């Protein structure tokens, strides 16, 4: 049978293990720090800068670190980021992510995973959940540049080739003020409400019942409750649902429902 490029890229050849050439040095992927008015974004970026400097000292390789701030729309922000990087894949760290010192930014996917969106876990301080929400992500650059559709969730909607990596990458510290806590809960819980699987329902229940000692827990709870109602009312209206990726719309929605 004929051997195709797709066979190589998708690892469809039996009994073959892909390895990188021993002794070869690969450039690290660019890191995008993506923020939108997070109160402690500058503090988080400074910490990430320090981490990158430490990487350069230890591994003699230093990834480019780029701060993309206050771009309207989730999709627009990621596409803008993709046009700023020079590596064939790029990391995305959210503005409210507190990245663990142990997280490995030198990670290199196998050749058949270079067109796959990777997502690492995050620890959610509002509800104690550990899953991909708020986690560090790795995107194929050209895929993001070429994207014209992406669905309600940019990360999972960008491509059918998606890889969830069950390793903790960061703490997602979005609950720094009332609006940020509400916004994060509202966006995520709209998505969870539209899913019908057991795991999504369990996660939604956790958002609706936050940890009693979590900062701004009442605001996050309100966001979750309002998200459930919003998703139920608009479940058949994709255009309205997409507003959860519009930060200007979210601010107006928050002020209407919570003031």
Residue ranges: model-predicted function:
Residues 2-83:
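N-terminal anchoring/stem segment of glycosyltransferases
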Residues 38-39, 72-73, 96-98, 124-125, ...:
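Short, solvent-exposed loop/turn segments at secondary-structure junctions
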Residues 26-28, 87-88, 114-115:
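A general structural motif
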Residues 1, 88-100:
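Short beta-strand-to-loop acidic/aromatic patch adjacent to the donor-nucleotide binding site
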Residues 1-22, 107-259:
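Catalytic-site signature of metal-activated, phosphate-bearing donor transferases
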Residues 50, 82-91, 108-110:
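Short, surface-exposed basic-aromatic patches at helix termini and helix-loop junctions that form
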Residues 95-112:
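Acidic donor-binding/catalytic loop of UDP-sugar-dependent glycosyltransferases
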